[in-house]
A protein has these predicted regions:
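An N-terminal assembly and electron-transfer interface module characteristic of large anaerobic redox
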Residues: 1-223
Length: 223
């Protein structure tokens, strides 16, 4: 959601779908889906997904799109890989098999396996998935979404550059708070960025400044 939403919103809007989001994560959202969580060992973002899907169902949404995405964009050509964790890769299968309300025949729950490896690979897969829509329309929507995703990333980078300049001009301090995209969710990050801000320290995400310097290799992690 937090990484690829610009793409999906643009893609579905171009195809004349109305995009409906569940509300911001809260404890109530978590509790809404707690009965369908199959294991306490799952990470909190996965548990929250049950509540978000349940909210959509109970608010009359009849078409829910929750793709399984093994591979993200290959942002750095010399990176070893660009795969997601097992939860992101296939958790929609867990949702499908544990949220009983999805058995309602009036609800369409679509969870295709897709790869964000490249625009071409993603477009070809979505053409297969949306066979009732002309292929050229699907490909055009993918292209628009891909451009919007790139523009959103440039906006993040621009803000990072602006923040660094502000720190240089004012002599203030900043911190790079690294994490996964879902750490933008206030229910998951528990207010840590706000706490840091309260001390007069700027918070930057790694993707807001990673373009400013090359990665020193070799590095001692599998990236």
């Amino acid at each position: 959601m937090f990484e690829n939403y610009p793409f999906w919103y643009t893609f579905f809007t171009e195809l004349k779908y109305q995009v409906v989001l569940s509300p911001t994560s809260t404890r109530k959202i978590y509790e809404l889906g707690i009965e369908s969580i199959p294991s306490e060992s799952e990470c909190y973002p996965a548990k929250l997904a049950h509540g978000h899907v349940t909210w959509l169902i109970r608010n009359g949404v009849k078409f829910i799109f929750y793709p399984c995405i093994p591979y993200e964009r290959n942002e750095f050509p010399d990176a070893v890989n660009h795969y997601n964790c097992p939860i992101v890769t296939s958790y929609a299968e867990n949702i499908k098999n544990n949220v009983d309300e999805l058995n309602d025949p009036s609800i369409t729950f679509r969870n295709p396996f897709l790869a964000f490896t490249s625009e071409e690979i993603l477009a070809n897969r979505l053409v297969e998935e949306f066979k009732d829509i002309p292929a050229e329309e699907v490909k055009a929507a993918v292209h628009k979404g891909w451009e919007e995703m790139a523009a959103a990333r440039r906006d993040v980078q621009k803000k990072g550059e602006e923040t660094l300049k502000y720190l240089e001009d004012t002599g203030r301090h900043g911190i790079v708070l690294a994490g996964r995209p879902y750490h933008i969710d206030p229910e998951i990050h528990h207010g840590i960025p706000d706490l840091i801000n309260s001390y007069g320290i700027a918070v930057l995400t790694e993707d807001s400044i990673s373009h400013l310097a090359p990665v020193e290799r070799p590095i001692r992690v599998n990236d």
